[in-house]
Amino acid sequence: MALSQHEMFEKLLDQLDLAADVRQDPSLTSGTVQNVTIHEQSRRYDFTLGFDAILPFQTFNAIATKLPLVFQQIAATDLSVVVTQPTITDELLAQYWQYVVTHAEIGTGIVRELCEKQVPTLENDRAVIKTENEQIRQYLIQQGLGKLEETYRQVGFSGLRMQAEVDEEQAAQSMAAFQAQRAEETAKMAKAAAEVVKQQAAKQKQVQTDGPVQMGRQMKMTDAPQQMVTITQEERSVTVEGYVFDVEVRELRSKRQLLIFKVTDYSSSFIAKKFSNGPEDEAMFARIQKGQWLRVRGSVQEDNYSRELTINAQDIQTVSHPDPTDDAEGEKRVELHLHTNMSQMDAMNPISDYVKRAKEWGHKAIAVTDHAGLQAYPEAHSAAVKAGLKMLYGVEINLVDDGTPVAYRADEPRDLASAEYVVFDVETTGLSAVYDKVIELAAVKMKDGKVIDQFEEMIDPGFPLSELTINLTHITDDMVHGSKSEVDVFKLFQQFCDGAIMVGHNVTFDVGFLDNGYERHGLADIDNPVIDTLELSRMLHPERKNHKLDTLAKQYKVSLEHHHRANADAEATGYLLYALEKEAAKMYGMTTLNQLNDRVGAGDAYKAARPSHAIVFAKTQAGLKNLFKLVSLSNVKYFYRVPRVPRSQLQKLREGLLVGSACSNGEVFTAMMQKGEAEARAKASFYDYLEVQPLPVYQPLIEAGLIKGEAHLKDIIQKIIKIGSELEKPVVATGDAHYLDQHDAIYRQILIHSQGGANPLNRHSLPDVHFRSTSEMLTDFSWLGEEKAHELVVDNSNLIANWVDDDITPVKDKLYTPEVPGVEENLKHDVMTTAHELYGDPLPDIVAQRLDKELKSIIGNGFSVIYNIAQRLVLKSNKDGYLVGSRGSVGSSLAATMAGITEVNPLPPHYRCPNCQYSEFFTHGEIGSGFDLPDKQCPKCGADLHKDGHDIPFETFLGFHGDKVPDIDLNFSGDYQPIAHNYIKVMFGEDHSFRAGTIGTVADKTAYGYVKAYERDTGQQLRGAEIDRLAQGDTGVKRTTGQHPAGILIVPADMDIYDFTPIQYPADDQNAAWMTTHFDFHSIHDNILKMDVLGHDDPTMIRMLQDLSGVEPKSIPTDDPGVMALFSGTKSLGVTPEQINSKMGTLGIPEFGTRFVRGMLEETKPTTFSELLQISGLSHGTDVWLGNAEELIKQGIVTLKEVIGCRDNIMMDLIHWGMEDSMAFNIMEHVRKGRGIPDDWQKAMRENENVPDWYIESCLKIKYMFPKAHATAYILMALRIAWFKVHYPLIYYTAYFSVRAEDFDLAAMSHGKEAVKAAMKEITDKGMDASTKEKQLLTVLEIANECLERGFKIKMIDVTKSDSHNFLIQDDHTILAPFRAVPGLGDNVAKQIVAAREEKPFLSKEDLANRGKVSKTLIDYMTTNHVLDDLPDENQLSLFDGLF
């Protein structure tokens, strides 16, 4: 089966191998390969790609850059983009501007210089460039404007018109300079032209465009290049060597080329430039591509434009720069701990980079273990399959205990109130009970809330105290020198504690030092009960943000004058204990020792636990599903600051999983570092394997003082290896990779720096965590001996990899749609029942044949359930009083019409009798739309005939063979959209309905900001090229998650969501109404059904118009003369064009209100529905109107109804003219995608005497065409709204301002039309300087002006009557504004005012401010505009208040 255009596009994306953030851009979802024209002689491929909307420039540029690279060995490439619904903004214009200027082949330097100095702005649907005077404006129009406009259109800005305007302020001072420059340029052009003639006469040497680069003189490879970072000033000659990360070749007006490339040696970066001298240089320019290593020699000069040092290259040549290799002999290691750019704001490279490197190194497998997420899995699967590598699917979870005990050895029911306590605290030389020493031990003995004895001893550790210890504890060497020995103090303390309950704050820390000390000296283990006040506080108050001793002391008013001295801390902890015990007794009835642990693990106990890292792998396919469930639980049920996995849940889902001890943040390493071997052994028993990492990875722990030095670090690692041996668990060496190469470390450093103090990694230097080779790892662990190093690095990593099944896949290989019993029969029944009701039984042949063809395709290909879901959603919305508009080509399906999914009838134009089902069809194209037929009575029964049918072929929806998966997009009212979404839950269940998830990554501009902040905070001055390199390195990293605005995924009843993806809340918002897919929905688009349930203003407005008027929208005629007159003038409105500043009466009418479309209406004056369809198609298409139909109409060749408007017209026109159906369809498909018409089809068209030549030429110009069904649905809604504008104007304006308007100048609107006109003029006078908000306001003011000119009034808000959101009709001529129309008054305040008013009337401005939550600024606004004239400033007391 031939690939669909979308499938071809997906295949192209795979070939382009785009960066993950680009590949996951939601705008690529609609992508299609519309055409590829192959020019065999010139070896050029012309690609035409199609999208729904203009691509973000970063995405477009990535495709445009990659395309020639991928095909460079085959052919040159050219790229055009066709966009179905282009929404052009100032931001998009600016983002594409430099690309457009570079690729527009502008002929003169003056024009290029002018363009490079400014960016066009959008004014009245045109892109405007300002010039200094009229001469330059004319010169720009002659030399470059058309090329700029055409280049914009080629990249998707269909319909964009460019305009040059004179900036009068600069005109006088610039005239002389311009004339001199033009004279000079004219002379240069003449000289250049002569040179071109001379060159063309000479025989040109042909040079291949592939192979090594060699330009200028050969450079000696023995000469060492200069480090870029050392070049800080202009120099006559430098030689550098580096990696090319950006390249551009510009065509100059002199016909020479300018090569500009950015190169880095990772110490810094440079821009290098070189001008061509003939075709040999140009061929060499073509060889220079991103990813190459070049040696460059030239001068360093300050660039006149950028003011930065730039290399003017004289000599350039390719140098060999081999990628890192893994030269270890024999079997290679497997990396089992690896983070990709899906580890949120923490790691750099996509998994595909690691897979490529692992394959090159000969590794048989590789793991992915991102922080708390699995979002790299789809890409990992694709990359691994492509490389033939085994992928190990894992995750680094945040493991927490379900609850930490409050008390230890607490089995006896000892009465807490009367118990005797020893509250103690230790001060130490560090945090490790294994490697640090106690230097102070203090305690108080308490009973009945009073101190009855004290213990305080200093201990000499036998070595000088560190500065950190002295500063933290305020204990000096003099204070401990000559003190008692550790063993003596411990013996005394054991006696002091005899029989008492021991108490401490974070007591496990203190007990750990005692346990290790007692063991070290052969003393008896602690057997006293122990209470931890830290955990007691957490158990009682999980809502508190911290439970530090000093924080709690303040809350409970306990004195703590010398915090971090043992005696002070001990006494404060004692008094805190009594306060907490009283709360425990009051809250939970805890009065005895054995009751303190009753609530361990209850409620939100998981929030109080400190997370530890652990690695979890899916060992089997069933294990992968358990992993999906585990990650879902952590994101949905156990999310607190980070996704958490309670140990009990991991145990419950452990089947098919492998659990490893992870990094230094894992509990085994932490226990070994801080508590000792016994504790570490107990923790290690939980895991399937243990992990250790290279010494440099632990460097931050040494820097922080948590580990005293490398000797202690090695001791910890050796003891973990020993524990593994004792427990018979493999110990494996992992790299904890966060980026690919060592030079990538700077990208992570910048990323972490951007997060400030919120990220604990900012407190110390970052470790070296690049992707290490086997040989590197063996070197890192060589201190263990060759045999042991090989065991940890190679043997055990492969052993664990072998534990995992080979055939695990996280992505399905086909589409799974929900099954609805009897759906095929029900659909057929509904369709045929409606058809018989409308057209009789038996059906007319044309209807019966059409339905038979459609139903065979729909049912035969399993599409019935998709129709069924859409049908149920639409019927539900209609029942609830909201019409639904269809989008796209679903109106091409008569079955969809008969099922009630769409109002659009695709049959040929026809009459239909609602009484006796008589019908009469017009099948030869003589009528464009059934709505245009003249009124007529039924010849059989005399009833008024209904008119319908728009002649739309079914093939435009499901393809010529009817086997294309239907994409049914529906426009629900924006108000009703949430209800429609929730109805899917009703239909399929909450566990089978999910919002489509998205992943937000660091964008290029954001990354640029990170780099600039890093530059500022580190006191550096980076070159622009280096900033660009660093920003490139940080783009694409996961920042957050989100949700598709309309997409709902439906899981089949016999499956669950974990068969496809984990789930989560968007952006970790635990209060979100919907859960989303954890995977970006694009990655599972082909596996699970997605319904696009969109929100739109038109159905909302129709509902409001119906509510206010009582008129049923479907009863509104489609050929009302007054409505049709709006499209050719303003007479229907009772105003002149001058009054409303528009020659057409379509302001505020969907599809027809913009200046661009109003201009089309002025030229064409449509009078029928079919002509309005033409306008819709012409305005949405690319190269359909401008330079095409517009010219044909102007020249009088054809009329509006004859030109090609919508794509479907082509197929139906050609069929009506006698061409074969399949050829007509194929020609339509080629033309609508901008692919032209192949020669043999053109020949067939020209041989058909019915096909006009102008028609063929028009087809050849078209780049994109709008579907007729889409246009029909939109215009049907537009005509209904327009009908109210003509016949119920006050209702229309009330609905428009309520539904469509967001920005208001209420003061102007309420003061009348002169004030509105003045406000409009103020905005229009700003021209290009007007803000986006002002331009949006201008549209609202235009409607307000029209409303006022028609004799209506807009009233300022009334505190006693206004609604919070909607405008209200006050009388036959007046509309009352809502509170939200007041500038700066948001929806919440508006609702609060109405709620407070309903409780009781406002007594004063003070009362309004207090109960309505209205700010002083808003009170002042209302006062100024006389809203509050009847209210005093303050509440006034009455003599009789309170007497009754």
Swiss-Prot record:
Q: What is its main location?
A: cytoplasm
A GO molecular function held by the record: DNA-directed DNA polymerase activity
Give the coiled coil ranges.
Answer: none
The record's SMART domains line, in alphabetical order, gives: EXOIII, POLIIIAc
| Stored Gene3D superfamilies | 1.10.150.870, 3.30.1900.20, 6.10.140.1510, Metal-dependent hydrolases (3.20.20.140), Nucleic acid-binding proteins (2.40.50.140), PolC, middle finger domain (1.10.150.700), Ribonuclease H-like superfamily/Ribonuclease H (3.30.420.10)
Q: Where is the Exonuclease domain?
A: 421-577
Q: Name one GO cellular component term.
A: cytoplasm
Q: GO biological process: what's one of them?
A: DNA-templated DNA replication
The entry's keywords: Cytoplasm, DNA replication, DNA-directed DNA polymerase, Exonuclease, Hydrolase, Nuclease, Nucleotidyltransferase, Transferase
Compartments (UniProt record): Cytoplasm
Q: Which reaction does it catalyse?
A: DNA(n) + a 2'-deoxyribonucleoside 5'-triphosphate = DNA(n+1) + diphosphate
EC number per UniProt: 2.7.7.7
State the family it belongs to: Belongs to the DNA polymerase type-C family. PolC subfamily.
PANTHER family under this entry? DNA POLYMERASE III POLC-TYPE, DNA POLYMERASE III SUBUNIT ALPHA
The record's function comment reads: Required for replicative DNA synthesis. This DNA polymerase also exhibits 3' to 5' exonuclease activity.
In Swiss-Prot or TrEMBL terms, this protein is called DNA polymerase III PolC-type
Q: Which organism is it from?
A: Lacticaseibacillus paracasei (strain ATCC 334 / BCRC 17002 / CCUG 31169 / CIP 107868 / KCTC 3260 / NRRL B-441) (Lactobacillus paracasei)
User: Highest lineage ranks of the organism?
Assistant: Bacteria, Bacillati, Bacillota, Bacilli, Lactobacillales
Gene name, please? polC
